[in-house]
Amino acid sequence: MVLSLGELLWDMLPSGKRAGGAPVNFIYHSVHNGADGYAISAVGEDELGDELVAATKNAGINAIIQRNAWPTGTVDVQLKNGIPEYTIVRGVAWDHILYTRQLINEVEKADAVCFGTLGLRSPESHDTIIELLKHTKPGAMKFFDINIRGDHYSKELIDELLRTATVFKLNDAELLLLRDMFNIRGTSDDEACRWFLNEYGLDYVILTAGSTFSTIVSKTGESSTVDTPHVEVEDTVGAGDSFSGTFTAKILNGASLTEAHRAAVNVAAFVCTQSGGWPTYPDVVPDYLAEAESNK
């Protein structure tokens, strides 16, 4: 069983609102790739909260959603000269996830737990999630998908979560930021990933570089690098989360590093061809990698 901990929210787009949140996206794609799972979050006792609970159910996402007196999470998206600017509203329901016996019981059963920096930006949810992660069973995957957003992070938080994690995922822009933050100089991207692997005793470090490539290094010395296949992009919402969810589900079901990596790349490419982070899956996800390789 796979769990995610953190934000559940509405993106308030100029065209209307869209349900999302990286941890919930992660569960959606884990479940579509062979895992059972739950998203754990909180929404307000308000109309937006009612609608968000309904949206997760309609998408087939199993979730343990606390209700509290804080407003349901939103992200205000404004277009400035055609470029979206995001304001992740503070002081919302998912900033106040309560530490409960029900959540402890779920975490104790989990084979993998996913979390990121945003879901721990507030003291209450930070303390809840950190305490819950202490209850994972031996050998459970603790997947830290850094997902840096705005100024909702600190070096102290990233270091704390790296010490908790067994898997660390970041993108090329986040690696640039972390090189400066951790004073990692004069090394290749692969060497920088291995620095995190060794410094924090991780099982895997995953680096994604958008439309270019992705690479995974492991504590066994095995690694996998895959060029990103070219697809007609509708939007990239949830693509990184779909990569994480697919990789986790495949590894838990016994896939090799290379098999899990290729599956994750294909799913992320598929998600980019669709609108939104919770697309309807086809019977079989296209093998974009095999197609690209056959055309070389």
Residue ranges and their predicted role:
Residues 17-21, 47, 71, 98, ...:
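Residues at secondary-structure transition points
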Residues 11-83, 90-94, 289-294:
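Substrate-binding N-lobe of the ribokinase-like
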Residues 30, 171, 240:
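Short, conserved phosphate/pyrophosphate- and ester-handling motifs at nucleotide-, phospho-/glycolipid
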Residues 9-12, 149, 174-176, 231-232:
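A short, flexible beta-alpha/helix-coil linker loop
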Residues 186-296:
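Conserved phosphate-binding/catalytic region of the ribokinase-like
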Residues 21, 73, 94, 117-119, ...:
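Glycine-rich phosphate/pyrophosphate-binding beta-alpha loops
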Residues 1-3, 55-57, 61-65, 83-223, ...:
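Ribokinase/PfkB-type carbohydrate-kinase core domain
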Residues 1-14:
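Positively charged, low-complexity intrinsically disordered leader regions
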